[in-house]
Amino acid sequence: AERTMAANRAAFDRCRIVPRMLRDVSVRDTSVEVLGMKLSSPLLLAPVGILELAHPGADEAVARAAGALGVPYIFSNQASVPMERAAAAMGSTPPLFQLYWSKSRDLVASFVQRAEACGSRAIVVTLDTTLLGWRTRDLDLAYLPFLHGMGIAQYTSDPVFQKLLDENALPAQAVKRRVTLDAVLGLLSMAQRYPGSTWAALRSGRALRAVRQFVGIFSNPALTWADLPFLRQQTRLPILL
């Protein structure tokens, strides 16, 4: 029934801009300091996963726009391009990285180290999606873009994830499926988004295995406060929850 969305909109509707009369506003300064960063305005661009649904180049386009405006961009864990490309597109504007904490601690550590290496100024941990919700519209439409290889570029570009693929390779008979047009189109979509040659990804089955591996480790409903010291050990960056 989307009651949560309605409640969120109602909460924002209750916010009011309070006018202040007879104040000198001939010179206005909207700058603010956040996490040691001097920002020209109190704005950050929030992470949005699978932006390629809007446009194939959307992730980098948003990063370039953020860079041009000097607005920090929290780039998504579920982006369709690696974080390094998004950070490069931002120029001198500082990026932040959204972290979905997966079942693999080694992968979490690798993501954090990559984010730090490409200039991220903070790790923003998403806590409300340790398990996907019961999304009735998505269920009615059989809608999960991850199954088409969308939005998993942080994973397929990561050496730890690639190592997991090698360690957890399925026997040939385990990946057989009935051949249908939808199945062929799904496999092609996965292969086109997998790094390297589309044909090689199809022949090796690696693109399909990557999607299977992602689905198996993405959710981590066991995450608790007790896990946070591990993250603190991986980085000196600020951690936002």
Regions found by a protein language model. Give the residues of each.
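N-terminal capping/small domains of soluble enzymes
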Residues: 1-131
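Active-site region of glycoside hydrolase catalytic domains
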Residues: 135
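An N-cap/entry alpha-helix motif that binds or orients negatively charged groups
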Residues: 1-36, 142-151, 156-218, 222-223
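A short, structure-level motif marking secondary-structure boundaries and short turns
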Residues: 46-48, 96-97, 212-214, 236-238
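Conserved, well-ordered alpha-helix/loop/beta-strand core segments that scaffold catalytic motifs
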Residues: 223-239
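Conserved phosphate-coordination/catalytic loops
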Residues: 77, 102, 218-225
